[in-house]
Amino acid sequence: MEASAAEQPSSPPPPLGDHCIHDGDFVVLKREDVFKAVQVQRRKKVTFEKQWFYLDNAIGHSYGSAFDVSSGGSLQLRKKLEEPASETKEAGTDNRNIVDDGKSQKLTQDDIKALKDKGIKGEEIVQQLIENSTTFRDKTEFAQDKYIKKKKKKYEAIVTILKPSTRILSIMYYAREPGKINHMRYDTLAQMLTLGNIRAGNKMIVMETCSGLVLGAMMERMGGFGSIIQLYPGDGPVRAATACFGFPKSFLSGLYEFPLNKVNSLLNGTFSAEMLSSEPKDSTPVEESNGELEEKEIAEQADEDNIVDAAENNSGEQRPMEIVPGDPENKEPKEKRSKRDYIQEKQRRQEEQRKRHLEAAALLGERNADGLIVASRFHPTPLLLSLLDFVAPSRPFVVYCQYKEPLLECYTKLRERGGVINLRLSETWLRNYQVLPDRSHPKLLMSGGGGYLLSGFTVVSDSLRADPSLKSCTGALDPHKAEEPAAKKQKCMESAS
């Protein structure tokens, strides 16, 4: 019954286009102020806000469409209702005579459940609740609107499907799982992208432990042009939020990753390709194509386990009806062949990962990055002091931290080190407002803080100018530098004569 209900489309879908929902797309479900990122797959049950449904009927419709969830789990496109003409509502002057004794509603919970079982829509249930309320007409007009809004939120199951973006995903993570993004608020992320001058064609370095949200925001703004080098701790980068963006494969060609524990060897000039081969072979593979390789590896591992379990069960059970001559001989090569294919595929992925690491090392070795973004749970001072050497002069850098004290220490160390200007430690202040006729005011509940930012620009310090290995670089930055002292000296001699 559920399958038949989910397969019946509510209306013929429009022709597919760039702004339409396709099978396999990553989308964001929205209900009131709650968001959830999912992937559109046919006949896959999705649970959202204590309701389950299928996304089959959403395929082909445009992003931003609203759907009603029916009792069978199918989505029905919600048509735009014409707003009724303004009618004079019967309302009271105040609520002083209204007593909340729990007896004002004639409908019981059993009656409401019976209405739901009959398949009555939420709008009709809300209308019956209004008609059976003995105190609704005595409420003020504002109280009536508040009552209707509250009942609609409870009984109307309206789901809006949105296209993923930096703003939507940052709001979703900050509301649902702020710990996974280091409590970075969405306005703070916007400030980071602006202060870091993220744009197409840049060569950026990012070190983040925010589930890939900062990385995805940078990739979205760069639009697939330029290169991003992600430094990661541990076995591999975490890009759960990056996968929710649903970037095409062309965006991943300019994305590189490099282990954080090899940065010091790269700075000292002792880095070599053999150091990458000494890493553990069972490290987490690079998530290409939004995690398809990881899912493929898990599926292959599950198939291998099923084959092994089947072999053990067949050997342990004695069933004459199932014994076929030659089966054990044919099964053993099949097992070996599947294991061999799995090992070869794993080695191929490791070799590709090693090549990408070498390419990232070559890009970092040029030391001409256009910017640096740091947003991690680690102390920012050692990270920033090490990674600034890979950034070209006159380029911005931005460091995020949930707390102010680590950034103050980082600020002091940068002042002592030199090579930076325009240092600024800032905190953004955000406040939401309710904007309604005669009821506009700041909301009572607001965010206590969204983190702190330390930003600045790199310059060529005196120690770098004195370094003979960088004379050619500084000379290229200012070709007339060698002529200025001679001209000034000649001018002084003329004045003395």
UniProtKB/Swiss-Prot annotation:
Subcellular compartments: Nucleus
Nucleus as UniProt keyword: yes
Compositional bias segments (type: Acidic residues): 289-307
Region feature (Disordered): 81-103, 275-354, 474-497
Any single GO BP term: tRNA methylation
Region (Substrate): 95-105, 146-155, 176-183, 415-423, 434-441
Primary location class: nucleus
Positions contributing to substrate binding: 349, 377
Biased composition (Basic and acidic residues): 328-354, 478-487
Annotated keywords: Nucleus, Phosphoprotein, tRNA processing
UniProt xrefs under PANTHER family: TRANSLATION INITIATION FACTOR EIF3-RELATED (PTHR12945), TRNA (ADENINE(58)-N(1))-METHYLTRANSFERASE NON-CATALYTIC SUBUNIT TRM6 (PTHR12945:SF0)
Family classification: Belongs to the TRM6/GCD10 family.
Assembly, per entry: Heterotetramer; composed of two copies of TRMT6 and two copies of TRMT61A.
Function: Substrate-binding subunit of tRNA (adenine-N(1)-)-methyltransferase, which catalyzes the formation of N(1)-methyladenine at position 58 (m1A58) in initiator methionyl-tRNA. Together with the TRMT61A catalytic subunit, part of a mRNA N(1)-methyltransferase complex that mediates methylation of adenosine residues at the N(1) position of a small subset of mRNAs: N(1) methylation takes place in tRNA T-loop-like structures of mRNAs and is only present at low stoichiometries.
Name of the featured protein: tRNA (adenine(58)-N(1))-methyltransferase non-catalytic subunit TRM6
Organism the protein comes from: Mus musculus
